[in-house]
Amino acid sequence: MNNIIKMLNEEQMKTDVPEFGAGDTVVVKVRVVEGGKERLQAFEGVVIAKRNRGVHSAFTVRKISNGEGVERAFQTHSPIISSIEVKRRGRVRRAKLYYLRERSGKSARIREKLSTK
């Protein structure tokens, strides 16, 4: 029984998910159905939390839109998500960046992680 569940979970997992973590700036392209038409909607922001649970993995992205903070939680392996693109790597010392909710402006900035070659 356990093997069947494990096999079904692996079957439903996406393989094209990039490696990212808290502090990274990502662009999530989401399929949106309006009327009878389907289009892609981009949501760009900072990953403030990531939850790794196999098929049930999720992450939360926060952005500032018109001076108002907007957060959206995504299921990593959801069929609604078309693609995830990492724009910028962030250098942070926490796994969950919930403290960014109280901050705005320069205090909400995240240092960039410079890649070593």
Swiss-Prot record:
Provide GO CC annotations from the record: cytosolic large ribosomal subunit
* One Pfam assignment: Ribosomal_L19
- Extract the GO molecular function terms from the UniProt entry: structural constituent of ribosome
What InterPro entries would the database entry show? Answer: Ribosomal_bL19, Ribosomal_bL19_CS, Ribosomal_bL19_sf, Translation_prot_SH3-like_sf
Any Gene Ontology biological process: translation
Keyword Ribonucleoprotein on entry: yes
Assigned keywords, A-Z: Ribonucleoprotein, Ribosomal protein
Record has Ribonucleoprotein as a keyword: yes
> In terms of domain of life, where is this protein from?
Bacteria
Task: Please describe what this protein does.
Answer: This protein is located at the 30S-50S ribosomal subunit interface and may play a role in the structure and function of the aminoacyl-tRNA binding site.
Q: Which PANTHER family match?
A: LARGE RIBOSOMAL SUBUNIT PROTEIN BL19M, RIBOSOMAL PROTEIN L19
| Family affiliation | Belongs to the bacterial ribosomal protein bL19 family.
- Listed name of the protein: Large ribosomal subunit protein bL19
The species this protein was found in: Shewanella piezotolerans (strain WP3 / JCM 13877)
> Which gene does this sequence derive from?
rplS
